[in-house]
Amino acid sequence: MPPANQSVSNGGFTVKLNKLFALAMLLVIAGFVCAAQSPQSPSSQPDTTGSADLIVNTVLLSHQWVVRDEKLDAVACSVEEGGVTPGTRTIVRFTVETPNIGDADIVVGDPNVHVANNDGLFEFATCHHHYHFRHYALYQLIDPVTGFVWKAAKKGFCMLDTDPVPAADGTEPPRSSQFRNCGAIGIPGNQGISHGWADTYRFFLGGQYFVLDGGDGQPVVPPGNYIIRITVNPPYTPTANEPCRFLEGIDANGQQICHQLPESNYSNNVGEVLITIPAHPGKTGVGPAVGQAAKEDFDEHDNKIPN
């Protein structure tokens, strides 16, 4: 074989091997540089400089709710976990979006690591056969006259970057999504919400509803005006199985006010929307989200596909 700097003739073409090798190396290096600089390639490191700040998108909530009669199958995990009697039920479905408007990411990481550490952040869902995040959001339907509160059927959450949040100046998010994998038993996940992104639970997903006809053991919701109240990262009282992760303060009874996720501001975590529940919504339903079928056989792990 000739030396690297010797000419080689082949079919009338003369090529310097050393130049060919150098050109190939340049192409490889250029490929790595372009991939590293591509806006579609998420950074391998989360942005933890600063503080996260979660809110509830009440504009989206006000535009995506519907009251209707809907068949709920016994095989749906939200039916089992919510204690709902299968069959045709009158429900109100709604969308919840929780943008991170802070200047740092919400970083949760792999559920398997948290379960191994027994830190109380996740619990195992026997129906879904994966882990659910505890205390991510609280769904309440409130009678504004009596103050009575109904709870929703949803039990589990998985935090992902599902939707970019436009900046105030109209620019795109500062970078691509970072958190795109819920994970499962033995399968690593990477959960969280990047700043400039939101985690969205569409109204057609499993558990995104209140049962209105008493089919979940709660009192029947009479026709009238009601408030849907969503609290993201709600406060909780710590227990032996759920220790206090981030302390906000002490209440009047001397109890700790704790949160699962750190934020710069907990006072903006509540969003409310006024809705009207009719007497007979029917299968077509009443509300701004009329016309789209539910996907009760999917939950947030199966059907929340990041953009």
Model-derived segments and spans:
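Juxtamembrane cytosolic interface motif at the C-terminal end of transmembrane helices
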Residues: 33-37
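Extracellular/luminal regions of secreted and cell-surface proteins that mediate adhesion/ECM remodeling
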Residues: 38-307
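N-terminal Sec-pathway targeting helices
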Residues: 18-20
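Short, Lys/Arg-enriched N-terminal segments with co-localized hydrophobic residues
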Residues: 1-14
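Bacterial N-terminal signal peptides
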Residues: 22-32
